Amino acid sequence: MIKQKYGVVYTPDSLAQFVAVLLKRTAESSSQIIRTVLDPSSGECALLNAAKKAFGTECAYIGIDVDREAVNATKDSFTIIHNDTILPQNVKRKAADYWRGKLPEIDAIIANPPWSSEKIYDRSELNSSGYTLASGQYDSYVLFLELAVNLLRDNGIFAFIIPDSLFDSQNERLRKFLVEKTCIRVIARLGEKIFDEVNRAATVIVCQKAAPTADSETICFRLSTDDRKAYLSGNGTLIAFFDDKQHIVKQSRFLCNSGYNFDIDTHTDEEHLLSIITSNSICWKDTFVFGRGVEISKTGKVVYCPNCGCAQGYKKKQLEAGKKKCVNCGSEIPVTNDTAQNVITRVPDDDSVSVFVGENIRRYKISGECYIKPHIEGINYKNRELYLPPKLLIRKTGLGIYCAIDYTGSMTSQTVYILKYADGNDRTPLEYYLALLNSRVVYYYYLKTYGENEWKSHPYLTKQIIYTFPIRPFNGDQIDTEIIALASKLMRKYDYSTDIKLERLIMKKYGLTKDEQELIIREMNNLPNLGAVNDMKMEV
């Protein structure tokens, strides 16, 4: 129960060894002597064992864990403290002050902290205990990272295994904290399936508690799909793949990025190309009004409150629990397969209207159609003017960028973003923006900036990401006219050769040289062999 509550997943030995080696290398490269190593969520002590192999028996190894069973199983091997690391029991002062008084000086911290997003701590208690990053939506590992920085001695080093939510917009404050207060030595994105039965991508981050300088460098690494398969099947080690594929960037780039984005997939020699692509872009908020459709899942499954009759969606946990609290009146609603009903269907009836869900939106076209009942109490259909045509539709979920134009006035679900002109007198053909949003040039920017270059369980676009897409202003010249004509042709019937012809025009629009075009093409051709992105590949 404790493991589920705290989001604990114990660390495979091979991953622990990888993290320990990175920690040791960082200590050696920065001439730091490591005498004391702490794991603040020690669990079965896989990371402390790996650290001991890396640093030897002369170091002191200390663990802290809230799980008494785990403490009892490991206390003979290491000094293990049974307590809650984040909010120590019966402690009235700040957590960092308490632990600094109880522990020896800490040279290094190695950890795979809990990843749970469940709020098990009272926010006011966290604030009183000195935590500054526990705001909005956050995972529990954020608290461990902040505490680690406060516990380490100056120039001390921490190496953490954390989820890829580090790169999400919700963690902008965490990235700012790390990029301003530490020297980020390593960021290694490992992807999914690193942990058995955990469908979340993992990242290893190694930081040193020191003020970064203009010359501070970060070693960046992404474990490719093929290398991950090899590693998981026992054909290679993480450190071998790391040594083969790593590259180095200036940490100062992260500080300058919008949202302090950790764009680790952008190599230094690609920065110039990206600066060309991102120059002279539209101001999204001045050009478009952004919205999304009916607040309902793509399946359209809802339950009805037996007290007030309001329909509402439900989460997987609520289905497992068999109940939920009504968002309107607070009554308990039974949530079972028998009580759930579909209000989105594939077949229309007399009072249903057309609605597009995410899977209907493809590049340049809308495929298929669904239907929804339009007057169900409790469902937020949004202002009907939002759906008036014409409008650009962008699929929220899935690998890649899928954009189409709707001229029918159909509703959409919340998994489809809607873009309409902010100026009602704007007569720019939407096909122009359609072409650029579906282009490989913009997709290259997306891959390099946000790193969404392979399948994962829950890929999705956000408004914040979309509003960074580098879209050149419409000039109405010959190139723009040809772009619109070819995009219109693709809307009528997709043809790969037309798609490639259009792409060459768009590359010309962005002023890319032949070498720069080939760099983008190579990146497209290196994408995984997945149906979602195979159309983006090009012959050189």
Regions found by a protein language model. Give the residues of each.
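Short, charged, surface-exposed secondary-structure boundary motifs
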Residues: V91, E197-V198
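Intrinsically disordered, low-complexity coil segments
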Residues: T26-I34, V91-G101, Q246-H247, T266-S275, ...
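Residue-level detector of functionally special positions within alpha-helical transmembrane segments
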Residues: D84, N112, K245-H247, S252, ...
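C-terminal substrate-recognition regions of SAM-dependent nucleic acid methyltransferases
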Residues: R153, D196-E197, T203-L393, R492, ...
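S-adenosyl-L-methionine
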Residues: M1-T11, A16, A20, V37, ...
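SAM-dependent methyltransferase catalytic region
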Residues: M1-I187, E192, V204-T225
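Short, flexible, solvent-exposed loop/turn segments with mixed acidic/basic and small polar residues
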Residues: A27-E28, K52-K53, I282-K285, D406-S410, ...
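Short His-Asn-centered micro-motif
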Residues: I64-D65, N83, G358, I394-K396, ...
